[in-house]
Amino acid sequence: STGCFDYRGDGEGQGIHAAVEWLGTQNWSNGHVAIYGKSYEGATAWEAAAQGSEYLKTIVPISGTTALGPLLYKNGSAEARSQVMHSNYGGSILDYDGDDLDNMCGDVLEGFLAGPMRYGLGELDPYMDKYYDERSHIDKALGTYNGSIYWVQGMQDWNVDPHQVFGGPPGTHWYQAYIDAGYEVGGMLGQWAVSYTHLRAHETLGN
């Protein structure tokens, strides 16, 4: 980690990568590391995949965000939450005391600007294209990651919507792109929202 909260940026990815490397090289480890999580935690799996560790063997993103830009802005329109989402996460580092100034590094300040600028300027914002490209982990992982993927995604999820799995830049379908690239891809997809799934084995038979 860079010590500066950069909200899904390269610094955050480096911190996750360091954890994967540590786990994969311990004497008690077989060298096979997996990451799973839901929503933002699911994004950490893609951040690790984009770093390309030899020890990361599989990821299980559960309604995990794959690319921050399309989460907040797609089809020529910005979501209302894009104005405040970065600020909400940035505010989580504040204790509202004199030490807060120590946390106001460049990445944090950039994050506070990112949402309102994308909301107000949309595709007319070339600087923020760089910001969001850095946070498109699914694009960076393709061809870099050497493990398998097991996607868990609810089709009724309005928080991390299915576009994060089946979308992509114009002409791109991420789910199919990984299959076409030779990755081992599986998934559990169904009619639920952003939540951990609780399905007993017999409930999936025949599906």
Model-identified regions with their sequence ranges:
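Accessory cap/linker subdomain of secreted extracellular hydrolases
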Residues: 47-144
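Short beta-strand/loop motif that positions the catalytic acidic residue
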Residues: 151-153
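Conserved alpha/beta-hydrolase "acid-adjacent" motif
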Residues: 159-171
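Catalytic histidine neighborhood in serine/cysteine hydrolases
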Residues: 179-195
